[in-house]
């Protein structure tokens, strides 16, 4: 478990105090995939680097598995960092070292294992990330996705409890991003690792995360289960991320619907309700007619969800709306 208690970080630049992270409290439960999303300058990288103490907090307390890591001395910090792996946006591989040597680097530096043990561990890691046949290659001979898989193998070398991902997919194409996210999900599931990732892409959060924190200007403005935050955003920053992911311009959509008759509502379904024949049932029971103006069905990690924008006319609308609510469908009246 990772806990932040009123943690903040301020940099001094040209004699001025510049806050990168305002006083922040959060909790990441063990075994979770926890996402932090924000635009450039939001403070997410600072928050991530505070977890493994690459940055020293200006105040507050950081507790990991019951240990106050803000109070560790140099030896304690070195021991703690062996429990935290990290992968980076631009891979940070040594160009003059082979794939196997890059993965072995943390083990070699730790000095706790024989050469034979290191070789065995490296072979295990390369098999896990699907690169057993690339052990003797150099980074220049690899694709971007393969380089990131080497980075993941290296981060797992010391058998960490926590894996930090700093924009790990932002330099990759969509197909490669999907394969890397699938690998991270497998690692989380099979090794019970706690994963904290930062990104500016809502789709990354939607695919792999259990919980999400949305950051803006050094502040966590919204936090919760991904489905709750993604489907029912409360803060303007969160709503912008959701609209960017959906590729929806609400002003344009309102203009498109201006000529449509009736009440316009947006329904959000989750889980089994996504596939239930609710619209037909409600129409028969209440006598309303409906037109589908927009819609999508997708998944948030393992949970299916659907969103429909409807124009409803005729019949008993109040009864129809009550029926939607009774079926645990979130309804938003747009007009």
Swiss-Prot record:
Residues 2-242 form the ABC transporter domain. Coiled coil: none annotated. ATP binds at residues 38-45. It holds the Pfam family ABC_tran. It catalyses: L-methionine(out) + ATP + H2O = L-methionine(in) + ADP + phosphate + H(+); D-methionine(out) + ATP + H2O = D-methionine(in) + ADP + phosphate + H(+). Its EC number is 7.4.2.11. GO terms for molecular function: ABC-type D-methionine transporter activity; ATP binding; ATP hydrolysis activity. Keywords: Amino-acid transport, ATP-binding, Cell inner membrane, Cell membrane, Membrane, Nucleotide-binding, Translocase, Transport. It is found in: Cell inner membrane. GO terms for cellular component: plasma membrane. Its main location: membrane. Gene3D superfamilies: 3.30.70.260, P-loop containing nucleotide triphosphate hydrolases (3.40.50.300). Part of the ABC transporter complex MetNIQ involved in methionine import. Responsible for energy coupling to the transport system. The complex is composed of two ATP-binding proteins (MetN), two transmembrane proteins (MetI) and a solute-binding protein (MetQ). This is Methionine import ATP-binding protein MetN 1. It comes from Pseudomonas savastanoi pv. phaseolicola (strain 1448A / Race 6) (Pseudomonas syringae pv. phaseolicola (strain 1448A / Race 6)). The gene is metN1.
């Amino acid at each position: 478990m990772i806990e932040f208690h009123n943690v903040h970080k301020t940099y001094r630049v040209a004699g001025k105090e510049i806050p990168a992270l305002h006083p922040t409290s959060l909790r990441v439960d063990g075994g979770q995939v926890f996402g932090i999303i924000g635009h450039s300058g939001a403070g997410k990288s600072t928050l991530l680097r505070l977890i493994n103490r690459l940055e020293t907090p200006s105040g507050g307390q950081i507790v990991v598995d019951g240990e106050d890591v803000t109070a560790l001395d140099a030896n304690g910090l070195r021991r703690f960092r062996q429990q935290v792996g990290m992968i980076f946006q631009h891979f940070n591989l040594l160009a003059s070292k082979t794939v196997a040597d890059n993965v072995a680097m943390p083990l070699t530096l730790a000095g706790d294992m024989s050469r034979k043990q290191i070789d065995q561990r490296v072979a295990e890691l390369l098999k896990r990330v699907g690169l057993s046949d690339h052990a003797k290659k150099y980074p220049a001979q690899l694709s971007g996705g393969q380089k990131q898989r080497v980075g993941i193998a290296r981060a797992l070398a010391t058998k960490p409890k926590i894996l930090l991902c700093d924009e790990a997919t932002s330099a990759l194409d969509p197909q490669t991003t999907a394969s890397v996210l699938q690998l991270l999900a497998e690692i989380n599931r099979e090794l019970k690792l706690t994963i904290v990732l930062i990104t500016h892409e809502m789709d990354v959060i939607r695919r792999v995360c259990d919980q999400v924190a949305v950051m803006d200007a050094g502040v966590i403005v919204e936090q919760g289960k991904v489905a709750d935050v993604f489907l029912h955003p409360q803060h303007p920053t969160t709503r912008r991320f959701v609209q960017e992911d959906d590729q929806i311009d609400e002003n344009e959509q309102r203009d498109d619907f201006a000529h449509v008759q009736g009440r316009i509502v947006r329904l959000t379904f989750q889980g089994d309700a996504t596939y239930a024949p609710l619209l037909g049932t409600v129409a028969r029971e209440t006598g309303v007619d409906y037109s589908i103006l927009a819609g999508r069905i997708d998944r948030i990690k393992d949970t299916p969800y659907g969103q429909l924008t409807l124009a409803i006319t005729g019949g008993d609308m109040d009864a129809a709306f009550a029926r939607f609510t009774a079926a645990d469908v979130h309804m938003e009246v747009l007009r």
